[in-house]
Swiss-Prot record:
This is Asp/Glu-specific dipeptidyl-peptidase. Residues 1-21 form the signal peptide. It is an enzyme of class 3 (hydrolase). Keywords: Aminopeptidase, Disulfide bond, Hydrolase, Protease, Serine protease, Signal. Homodimer. GO terms for cellular component: cell surface. Its EC number is 3.4.14.-. Changing R673S: The Asp/Glu preference is inverted, i.e., peptidase activity toward Leu-Asp-MCA nearly disappears, whereas that to Leu-Glu-MCA partially remains. It comes from Porphyromonas gingivalis (strain ATCC 33277 / DSM 20709 / CIP 103683 / JCM 12257 / NCTC 11834 / 2561). Disruption phenotype: Cell growth is retarded. Complete loss of hydrolysis for ac-DNLD- and LE-MCA. The efficiency of peptide utilization of proteinaceous nutrients is reduced in mutant cells. It holds the Pfam family Peptidase_S46. Disulfide bonds join C69-C86. Its main location: other. The record marks R673 as: Is essential for the Asp/Glu P1 specificity of DPP11.
Length: 720
């Protein structure tokens, strides 16, 4: 092969052909070179109606929801659809035993009944600009050859602010700018974003619909979950972002989705826009090994222990179930994902494929007289090996204690608070106590049970102590051996008995007569301090290994782009707006088994189990089924569709993403992937990978027949 210069990135990619027909989480700027193929697959829209850098398009109806999901605007009054699991925390926050919206659902029959939410946002992408030349020019001014500024969010934000101009945000209310790196720092894009924070809960089905199948069915196809919730964006009277106010009005958006009742058939065109979070497409073989045997294995083991304790307590007490349902669900999602990824690595040859890819690059580089690609691979391999023990200890403390034990987040008094408590200024002492109380209440809130936390802690610490040698333990944890003869239960009981944070009553007693000395000797504070000291120590010891890997990855990815300039390459997901397209299609997971593309309400009833909370069927939904009262939402055969699957390429962050037909009309909401395709974060698996999508007709049926909320249907533009 003749030696070639690396073409400008977008130009090089424009020459490529797709490796797998439906693979790719494509940048919006890459639409032009994918458009012809999309048309061949069935797309009937104009290119500029999907993405128009100089005007409005369907892109303007897609939002980043609450920092980690996707949503879509479906009315001219700012109505937003997303997944039930994306809105779960907000639904839970409004739930009580008296008004249990998690169990019974919530439907605002008037706009005045819509519920405000704390600390929530939706973000529109106003503009996307290629700033690669600008960033690289600025980077040339950096003299340090080992500088990592080319990937530094802080540095890139400085460049974004500089490029946007002085007082940009002041002149443009609600707007902000951000530069993100792609392909390991070989491409840079600047995003202009508009963020709204007055976002109100409008509707949510009962969890028996929105979470039907729960953890048993998570990552599984066939699926029967009505995973949706409804919110509304509010703005000031000029349409600008504003904090919550009764004077705010529903947002009039630039664009919103029409909703199709046409349904789907096998091989129909399907397309998704959204904000995929993280993928590892450019991992080397050693990085795949590390991800599996350290990161995923530890996450699986420690979360399995924690979730086992939580589930037992939730099933034994309805109040605990309300309090811990969101925590359990959040933990389960990453847990199941790790299991699925490891399964794919083991059974689908992903590690071997990455080995073949890097071997091919090394051989190609040698022919070009370019040893730097081989050097990059060797640098990655060596660094992964060097950091293995530190990384294992880091993941154990993160999954086993930081994420696993709630009281590990006990408030550690600041220097200013300590001084205030030592002084004679009563108001300063009160302010210090109030600040400590606020931090205490962040974990010991209405959704906290000290008894559950104790049981989780005993289980987690027992496992942690088996894995970590005594000399590497956080200092306070060494007391398990030194003072309690290895009795973890006695250690945890002692912490709660003697800590001012052991209960609200204990904290109130302390607050009445605050003592710096008591805080300094508090076992929960000492536990938290020693845990975070060790966590920071491990983090700081691992940091020096990051830079050589990131620099080597930049070279490695540049080599792949140069070598395969005649093939498509898309950047790893990083929570930026992307599109993917494919077909509605079933699949065969193994010999003599085929899963069709569509599930129906018949399957919900087949799975019904009144004695298993995961498969309880809502009585209103059951009545609709028994009457066959499906109306205009039924399919051509008269059955009620629930979900379908498609070959689109998605990952975490795509939850809630709009799924469109060939006309750009909304046909469903993406909410999951199948087990067999979860390894798509590393490598797309064409025969197995499927996005799992709740059918929009099921969403509408539930709003109509279960929620009885006709006003929402009247607000949407529903087409045949």
């Amino acid at each position: 092969m003749k030696k070639r210069l690396l073409l400008p990135l977008f130009a090089a990619l424009c020459l490529s052909q797709i490796a797998h027909a439906d693979e790719g989480m494509w940048l919006m700027q890459q639409l032009g070179r994918k458009y012809a193929q999309m048309k061949e697959r069935g797309l009937k829209m104009k290119e500029y109606d999907l993405y128009n850098p100089n005007g409005t398009s369907l892109k303007d109806a897609v939002v980043l929801f609450d920092g980690g999901c996707t949503g879509e605007v479906v009315s001219d009054r700012g109505l937003v659809l997303t997944n039930h699991h994306c809105g779960y925390d907000m639904i839970q926050a409004h739930s009580t035993l008296e008004h249990n919206y998690l169990e019974n659902g919530f439907w605002a029959m008037r706009e005045a009944d819509e519920l405000p939410n704390k600390d929530i946002s939706v973000v529109f992408i106003d503009k996307i600009e290629d700033v690669t030349d600008y960033v690289k020019k600025e980077l040339k001014a950096i003299k340090d050859p080992n500088s990592m500024d080319y990937l530094s969010p802080k540095y890139l934000q400085k460049l974004a602010d500089k490029k946007a101009g002085k007082n940009f945000s002041a002149k443009n209310p609600g707007l902000s700018v951000e530069i993100k790196a792609f392909y390991g720092g070989n491409l840079y894009l600047m995003f202009t974003k508009k963020t709204y924070t007055d976002v109100r809960l409008v509707g949510a089905p009962p969890s028996s619909i929105g979470k039907f199948g729960a953890d048993t069915d998570n990552w599984i196809w066939p699926r029967h979950t009505g995973d949706f919730s409804i919110f509304r964006i509010y703005a000031d009277k000029n349409g600008n972002p504003a904090p919550y106010s009764e004077d705010n009005v529903p947002l009039k958006p630039k664009r919103f989705f029409n909703i199709s009742l046409g349904g789907v058939q096998e091989n129909d065109y399907a397309m998704i826009m959204g904000f995929p979070g993280t993928t590892h497409r450019y991992f080397t073989a050693s990085e795949v090994d590390e991800w599996k045997s350290i990161d995923n294995d530890i996450r699986i083991r420690m979360r399995d222990i924690r979730q086992g304790v939580m589930l037992r307590e939730m099933l034994a007490d309805p109040q605990i179930k309300i309090m811990y349902s969101a925590k359990y669900a959040a933990s389960q999602n990453a847990y199941k994902r790790a299991i699925g990824a490891n399964w794919a690595i083991k059974t689908r040859g992903l590690r071997q494929n990455k080995q073949a890819m890097q071997d091919r690059l090394i051989a190609w580089g040698a022919k070009q007289g370019t040893p730097r690609y081989e050097e990059a691979v060797h640098e990655i391999d060596a660094t992964v090996a060097k950091r293995a023990d530190l990384r294992r200890r880091y993941w154990m403390i993160e999954e086993g204690i930081i994420r696993g034990i709630e009281f590990a987040r006990s408030p550690i008094p600041t220097e200013d608070e300590t001084k205030a408590l030592q002084g004679n200024d009563a108001s300063a002492r009160k302010e210090a106590i109030d600040k400590i109380r606020t931090r205490y209440s962040k974990f010991a809130n209405k959704d906290y049970s000290a008894e559950v936390d104790k049981k989780v802690a005993v289980a987690m610490l027992t496992e942690y102590l088996k894995e970590i040698p005594y000399e590497n333990l956080p200092l306070h944890l060494r007391l398990v051996k030194d003072r309690f003869a290895g009795d973890v239960q006695a250690y945890v009981d002692d912490i709660f008995a003697r800590s001012v944070f052991g209960s609200e009553a204990q904290f109130d007693a302390f607050a009445a007569v605050p003592s710096v000395e008591k805080l300094a000797e508090d076992p929960m504070v000492l536990f938290a301090s020693s845990v975070f000291d060790e966590y920071r120590k491990l983090y700081n010891e691992l940091r020096p290994y990051d830079d050589p890997i990131l620099r080597a990855q930049r070279t490695y990815i540049a080599g792949l782009l140069e070598m395969d300039g005649d093939q498509d390459q898309f950047p790893d997901a990083n929570l930026t707006l992307r599109f993917t397209y494919g077909q509605v299609k079933g699949y065969s997971p193994r010999d003599n088994v085929y899963y069709g593309h569509q599930t129906t309400l018949d399957g919900v009833m087949e799975k019904e189990d009144p004695d298993n909370w995961e498969f309880v069927v809502d009585p209103k939904l059951k009545a609709v089924y028994e009457r066959k009262d499906f109306g205009r939402y039924a399919d051509r055969s008269g059955r009620m569709p629930v979900a379908f699957c498609a070959t689109t390429h998605t990952t975490g962050g795509n939850s809630g993403s709009p799924v469109m037909n060939a006309n750009g009309e909304l046909i469903g909401l993406n909410f999951d992937r199948n087990w067999e395709g979860v390894g798509g974060d590393i490598q797309y698996l064409a025969d197995y990978q499927r996005s799992i999508i709740v059918d929009i007709r099921y969403v509408l049926l539930v709003i109509d027949k279960v929620g009885g909320c006709q006003r929402l249907l009247d607000e949407m533009n529903i087409v045949p």
